[in-house]
Design a protein with these regions (language model features):
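Feature captures the catalytic cores and cofactor-binding loops of soluble hydro-lyases/lyases
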Residues: 2-140
Length: 140
């Protein structure tokens, strides 16, 4: 494992994966290809927190309104392509509260605002439709 003081550019994702080739089924995981980058940070990492929801971002917003302390929020949006679970306001809150990034198995919106936010954002794609606020879902 690299020294904590090493600059990020000196240690690539591939290097990190090389160090963990013997781990099978442990805590080390890599996301499959298919997620697009929308945030202001292209590379990010951190302890994971989770939200599971379907076309309702109430719990996503609630999570990102708390101190992130460098964590990454992974949102299981069931792969819905009909409603955006993260937009510009939510991304700005994530950056303001110290989250490293958000990974969405679903869609996001407000591409220009996401790109301007100081947080990493990965998602399946863009869709302009907002969510319906029902307060449903699960959060770790």
């Amino acid at each position: 494992m690299p020294q904590a003081a090493a600059p990020a550019a000196a240690f690539s994702t591939c290097d990190f994966c090389d160090l963990h080739t013997q781990e099978q089924g442990g805590p080390f995981r890599v996301l499959p290809p298919g997620l697009q980058s929308f945030g202001g940070r292209t590379a990010f990492f951190g302890q994971v927190s989770t939200v599971q929801c379907f076309e309702d971002n109430s719990l996503v917003k609630a999570a990102l309104d708390t101190p992130g302390a460098g964590r990454v929020l992974v949102v299981d949006g069931a792969g819905s392509l009909r409603r955006a679970l993260v937009g510009g306001n939510v991304a700005a809150a994530a950056a303001r509260n110290g989250w490293a990034g958000v990974v969405v198995h679903g869609c996001v919106r407000d591409a220009a605002e996401l790109a301007a936010a100081g947080v990493g954002i990965r998602a399946l794609g863009l869709v302009p439709m907002p969510t319906v606020k029902r307060g449903e879902g699960q959060r770790d």
